[in-house]
């Protein structure tokens, strides 16, 4: 158990001596009965996650508007571990929805854990903090799919740069050789740093990038729109060595015209007279407590995330008529696209025999160091520093390229610590090895298979049915097979000779397609970068759930802003795309009432 410490107050200090009046920060309420009865909210945001707090913060910049955020989990300020980058793993399962998928046929009937954050800030308070903008091809593809050129790379890059505050990390080492400053912003809300952990593995990777530059070239900055090669990792951590999330970067700077109700679930959005005008929210603290309704003067913005948002819409009568009817819900807006198109990334791991020194550390000592100076291993986002982005050659794709374009990788290697590991189930030979370094994980960035979210019943407190349809398309395991072979080539470089032996997971003799498919059937998992369950589409499209202005098709007074509207999982981690979509949505919403 990580020890609790006194909570810090990050509110802005008064500038009264300078003659400047600064508004107090957002007001947090622990129970619905604590909400003030004399406030009419212009906007109600259902979900205080990554996107929801961006929207609330930006809308609150108009002092005339009152904004209410309703979050199912606790405040991040009540959870010490959210502040310490190296303690992210301690947040699960306590502050997680702890979802489980239905059995996946192609994985031998295995059900997979599906982590989603349940606290203020959502996954930005809970995740691995990796900051990737993905490829310019992804954004140009989003623009084409949605019919909105505001999502093209050339249009969205200025949005991302304005929101970013890139700086040196808590070690204050120079950034030269780690990033390209010209593609970063320095005056935004979201703090970003490059990684600087000193480990022997770093030099071997950099030497390999020189030796095998055709497949693994060194890439100075993965966020310039062309993420191909071996690169230094960037993290949403501030220069004080603390996590930067939507809760710390956005919410803490708002005025007291933002009210936040925590530990309360939005159960559905209520329409006026069972029509298509949805401006009221219904919420409760648990299944046995009374349900309360509040009406927004202007709009309701659903920001529950890729799982919760479609569940909220379906419980509100928005979804496929057949699905809703089977769960005893009256259909108010018949849209079978709700909950469909779940796009995620399949992943596996590689472990290998190595004589390199372990990179484990004494967590207790590291925590003392972090509390004292906000430095040391717990101030870092990862124990090693590099990501590798690999684009497979055309002859390995069997004529089908699922990527967004030539600037886009198919595979990501994310390197982890070197440590003694327990053997995976059934792999007894593993115990004969000395140290073992995993690549946790090896990710198929453009997994083609599409899954779905459906209702298990009409109880909003029940978990929905999550079907990833993992390996529903043959190209998906094929790309992971080639990723394993690519990783083996990297680890067989001259730089690694004498330090790294054969892979032990999968076994070194697993080389054929059949052998690797058998391995993948038992080792593949979701990298929980799910998007697309309320996909955005052109205004006139007969498919999709939200229009390019984030309004839910067939309704008024209702928008969705979160990962669920992003049409497909991009070449990278989804945190920054969610921030960018939310920043753009905030501008559109504000302009609607200017």
Swiss-Prot record:
Name by which UniProt lists this protein: Pyranose dehydrogenase
Homology family: Belongs to the GMC oxidoreductase family.
Enzyme Commission no: 1.1.99.29
Cofactor remark: Binds 1 FAD covalently per subunit.
Keyword Kinase: no
Glycosylation sites recorded in the entry for this protein: 98, 113, 198, 274, 341
PANTHER family in alphabetical order: GLUCOSE-METHANOL-CHOLINE GMC OXIDOREDUCTASE (PTHR11552), GLUCOSE-METHANOL-CHOLINE OXIDOREDUCTASE N-TERMINAL DOMAIN-CONTAINING PROTEIN (PTHR11552:SF201)
Record bears the keyword Signal: yes
Signal peptide: 1-25
The species this protein was found in: Agaricus bisporus
Obligatory cofactor(s): FAD
Pfam families: GMC_oxred_C, GMC_oxred_N
Catalytic activity: pyranose + acceptor = pyranos-2-ulose + reduced acceptor; pyranose + acceptor = pyranos-3-ulose + reduced acceptor; pyranose + acceptor = pyranos-2,3-diulose + reduced acceptor; a pyranoside + acceptor = a pyranosid-3-ulose + reduced acceptor
Tele-8alpha-FAD histidine modified-residue sites: 126
pH profile: Optimum pH is 4.5. the enzyme has a second pH optimum at pH 9.
């Amino acid at each position: 158990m990580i020890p609790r410490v006194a909570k810090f107050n990050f509110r802005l200090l008064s500038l009264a001596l300078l003659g400047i009046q600064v508004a107090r920060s957002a007001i947090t309420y622990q129970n619905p009965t604590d909400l003030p009865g004399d406030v009419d909210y212009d906007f109600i945001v259902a979900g205080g996650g990554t996107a929801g707090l961006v929207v609330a913060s930006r809308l609150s910049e108009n002092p005339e508007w009152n904004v209410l955020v309703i979050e199912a989990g606790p405040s991040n300020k009540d959870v010490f571990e959210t502040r310490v980058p190296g303690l992210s793993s301690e947040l699960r399962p306590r502050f997680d929805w702890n979802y489980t998928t239905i059995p996946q046929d192609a994985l031998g009937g295995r059900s997979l854990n599906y982590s989603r954050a349940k606290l203020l800030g959502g996954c930005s308070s809970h995740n691995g903090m990796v900051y990737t903008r993905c490829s310019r091809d992804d954004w140009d593809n989003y623009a084409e799919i949605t019919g909105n050129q505001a999502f093209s790379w050339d249009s969205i890059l200025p949005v991302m740069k304005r929101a970013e505050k890139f700086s040196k990390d808590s070690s204050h080492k120079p950034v030269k050789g780690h990033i390209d400053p010209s593609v970063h912003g320095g005056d935004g809300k979201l703090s970003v740093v490059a990684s600087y952990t000193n480990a022997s593995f770093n030099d071997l990777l950099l030497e390999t990038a020189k030796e095998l530059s055709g497949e693994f070239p060194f890439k100075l900055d993965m966020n310039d729109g062309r993420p191909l090669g071996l690169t230094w990792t960037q993290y949403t951590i501030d220069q004080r060595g603390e996590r930067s999330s939507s809760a710390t970067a956005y919410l803490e700077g708002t005025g007291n015209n933002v009210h936040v109700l925590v530990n309360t679930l939005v159960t559905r959005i209520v329409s006026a007279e069972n029509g298509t005008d949805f401006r009221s929210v219904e919420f409760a603290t648990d299944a046995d407590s009374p349900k309360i309704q509040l009406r927004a003067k202007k709009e309701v913005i659903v920001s529950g995330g890729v799982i919760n948002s479609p569940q909220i819409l379906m419980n509100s009568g928005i979804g496929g008529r057949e699905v809703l009817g089977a769960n005893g819900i009256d259909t108010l807006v018949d849209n079978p696209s709700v909950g469909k198109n779940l796009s995620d990334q399949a992943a596996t791991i590689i472990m290998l025999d190595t004589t390199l020194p372990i990179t484990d550390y004494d967590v207790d000592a590291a925590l003392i160091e972090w509390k004292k100076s906000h430095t040391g291993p717990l101030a870092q986002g990862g124990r090693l520093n590099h990501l590798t982005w690999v684009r497979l050659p055309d002859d390995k794709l069997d004529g089908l390229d699922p990527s967004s374009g030539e600037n886009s990788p198919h595979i990501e290697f994310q390197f982890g610590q070197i440590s003694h590991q327990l053997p995976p189930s059934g792999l007894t030979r593993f115990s004969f090895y000395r140290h073992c370094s995993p690549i946790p994980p090896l990710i198929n960035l453009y997994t083609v298979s599409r899954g779905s979210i459906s209702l298990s019943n009409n109880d909003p407190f029940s978990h929905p049915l999550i079907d990833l349809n993992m390996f529903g398309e043959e190209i998906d395991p094929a790309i992971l097979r080639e990723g394993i072979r690519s990783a083996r080539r990297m680890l067989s470089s001259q730089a690694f000779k004498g330090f790294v032996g054969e892979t032990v997971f999968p076994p070194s003799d697993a080389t054929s397609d059949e052998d690797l498919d058998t391995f993948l059937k038992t080792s593949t998992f979701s990298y929980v970068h799910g998007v697309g369950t309320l996909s955005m589409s052109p205004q006139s499209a007969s498919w999709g759930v939200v229009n390019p202005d984030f309004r839910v098709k067939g309704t008024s007074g209702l928008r969705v802003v979160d990962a669920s509207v992003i049409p497909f999982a991009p070449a990278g981690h989804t945190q920054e795309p969610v921030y960018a979509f939310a920043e753009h949505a905030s501008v559109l919403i504000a302009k609607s009432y200017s």
